[in-house]
Amino acid sequence: MIKIDDRSKKQGLKKGENIMRVKRLVSLALAGMLAASVALTGCGSKKEATTSDGKTIVKIGTQQMPNDEGIAKAMNYFQEEMGDSVSVEIVEFSSGKDVNTALAAGSIDFGLEGSCPASLAIAQDLGVELIWIHEVLGDVESLVATGTSGINTVVDLKGKKVAVPFASTAHFSLLKAMENAGLSASDVTVLDMQPDKIYASWNSGDIDAAYIWEPTLSQLSNKKTVITSGELAKAGYMTSNVEVVRTKFAEAHPDIVVAYVKALDKSVSMYKNDESTAIKTIAEAMELTEDNAKFQMSGSTWLTGSEQISSTYLGTSSAKGAVVQNLYDTAEFLKTQGSITKVPDKSVFEKAVNPKYIETALGK
């Protein structure tokens, strides 16, 4: 039986709210906190966690998302692939910030987060590797406007109030959309809000638009879609949800990391080959209707292991793919927002992207 530790519920959050709580005004403090976590973790060697009967405890940090990891959790694929010598614990978080903090402290081994928090983790030298892309974001994350806002295009945002969780993939996409439309930061009032606050502010009429993801996106009533992350991806600004693993853990247990990616590849295969079962699985796990689950799942691009190691994404061990440049560009964005003070050399990101576990899983 997989043990589940839902820390998002302990924080009083509603199920399914994937909250990116990285505040712009405290982003430098966050960077310092992460650095301190690394320093404290390095003060002593951490003994490997085991159960009373000697099984290796593997802690997978996750968020409530309608993706391949959601299927793998529900179908018990992680335990199946990792075997009887491993005890899998699922730890649920509500933001990439919280996932990074847990990774820095060594309290989880794997972590699901957006490409922005992943870039931040690499730039802050948290000792992680990017091993998988859960999904390339499309309609599942979008800029939407209220029906009474008068906003039909990105240009119409001028003089309006737009809410978005800062330092998130949505924030990155919003600012790129504004830049392409010729709008500066002073043209638009951009407000840092968590998804639950966006929902409340939308209903109270306090904001004109929001850039947000599912499931909050579907909960906003009387809305018009202005632009989607899928459209921005086609313009060269790809955002995604990715998986990172602690480098020290991966070096000690490469077989477990291979088993992890096998579980995800199995989930993607289910979605591509048996869509109805995949939709039903996500609907039950996230307490959604099947129609809603189908809508949310179709709003992003799921990649098989073979697709992951193409030049468009992770690439191969001998020739890293476009994700390296994407992470580097994201770090440049994070620097402009004050989330980091320095962008490391691109070689740092190239080293952190590690497709070898997928290659091994595929017998390459």
What are these regions (language model features)?
Residues Q63-P66, S94-G96, G106-S119, Q124, ...:
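Beta->alpha turn/N-cap motifs
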Residues A252-S339:
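Secondary-structure end/capping motifs
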Residues Q325-K364:
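Conserved C-terminal helix/tail region of periplasmic/extracytoplasmic solute-binding proteins
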